[in-house]
Amino acid sequence: MSGRNQIIGALTIGQSPRTDVIPEIQKFFGDAEILQAGALDGLSRAEIDALAPEAGSGDVLVSRLSDGSWATMAEAKLIPLLQRQAEALCASGAKLLVLLCTGKFPDVLRVGVPVVYPQRLLYAVVPVLSGGRRVGVVNPDAKQLEQSQRNWGDALENVFVMAANPYQQDTDWDAVAETLAEERVELVVLDCIGYTRKVKERIQEKTGKPVILPRTLLARVVGELL
């Protein structure tokens, strides 16, 4: 594939456009055009609230809405909405879909083009880079910690999980870094597309440890396909 005249479909589990994400990663895609769509596009707040997770409803996901706020959703409820938007992106000419979410999705999107799931990249790369050392994983919401511990515990020998919301203006990133340092982690994973390069740099500076940012990991890998 050549970057020139290629069309990439960027599919968020929240609402598009992701003005907090795409400007930071577009440079990795060369001349490729990026089309955006979101599972929650066109939904009212009441309809979005109806997607909230219930006890025992499976994995919990968090994403940004177009007004800058965020929503918490059950993965299972999102899948039909994602499928609809994936089909729309392909109908608009997308030759490759990129999911803007690090959730542990099954291979559920049925479209005629490749789909890149960031979680699969993370679970392939992080165990290699950690080399058995203690890894700190930061998730957006405390409701995700049990699933994060379970999922990452299957991939890593020694993991610590914590919550810090990338969409909340008053999140104390210095306190997050302090907790990670106290836990003696040797590698940090910011387990959400919503975390920014600025957050990565802040935590890296405060902990002195390498920090993996999913949005740029995803973009660099996709860039190799163009």
Feature map (PLM): residue ranges:
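N-terminal glycine-rich phosphate/adenylate-binding segment common to multiple enzyme folds
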Residues: 72-119, 189-196
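Hydrophobic alpha-helical
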Residues: 96, 172-173, 186-207, 214, ...
